[in-house]
A protein has these predicted regions:
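Conserved SAM-binding loop and adjacent beta-strand
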Residues: 1-11
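S-adenosylmethionine/decaboxylated-SAM
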Residues: 11, 15-202
Length: 202
């Protein structure tokens, strides 16, 4: 199973966020081989079985339709079934910047986004998904550390710095507080303002 998250056990962080934040509607964009999906779904399982919540997780990817590095939808489904998590997540094929149209404004509690992220991807995310996140909701975005901005493919293809966008983007500055977990590949956590103050970093 491929994931840059594996080395520093980011899966446990994702699961913990789900359990702590208790989202009713969680969405993931970017699945690859399903590492993050498995851990998010494990969190959803806890919410349903321990807390009696009716939480949902929908995970989107282009899978075989993506010409570069991609996972196979059927294989990811097999992983989920093998872990007993298949009933806690719905895998869907879809484009990252089209499927936001499936959701009403303010309807998403937690969004995990990991699609070869760079600064331009983050800008596009804020333009398209921001209104879909409820006040007090959270966006988990792979990347955000200085080290992550310097990786080989970011430099080779002259990709825009994620960190620069975090510091300068108007929507982020006005509507979110954020923190970055620095261990590679890093994870940016953006808390949308306006909800319960205990859900935001001061």
């Amino acid at each position: 199973m491929r994931s840059s998250y594996i080395e520093n056990r980011y899966g446990e962080i994702l699961k913990t966020f789900v359990i702590a934040l208790k989202p009713l509607v969680a969405v993931e964009v970017g699945v690859l081989d399903g590492y993050s999906t498995i851990h998010l779904a494990a969190g959803i399982k806890v919410l349903r079985e321990v807390f009696g919540m009716f939480s949902t997780l929908e995970s989107y990817d282009l899978f075989e339709d993506y010409e570069y590095k991609h996972g196979e939808k059927e294989k990811v489904q097999e992983y989920l079934t093998g872990y007993g998590l298949d009933k806690f997540v719905l895998l869907k094929k879809g484009c990252a910047f089209e499927v936001y149209k499936n959701y009403e404004d303010g309807s998403i509690d937690l969004l995990h986004f990991d699609i070869s992220n760079d600064g331009k991807v983050l800008e596009h995310l804020m333009e398209t998904w921001h209104n879909k996140i409820r006040a007090g909701g959270v966006i988990l975005f792979e990347g955000g550390s200085p080290e992550r901005d310097e990786i080989e493919w970011m430099k080779k293809y002259n990709k825009k710095s994620i960190r620069k966008v975090l510091k300068e983007n108007e929507i982020i500055n006005n509507e979110y507080t954020w923190v970055v977990y620095p261990h590679y590949p890093s994870l940016t956590v953006l808390f949308k303002k306006g909800g319960c103050s205990s859900c935001e970093l001061q």
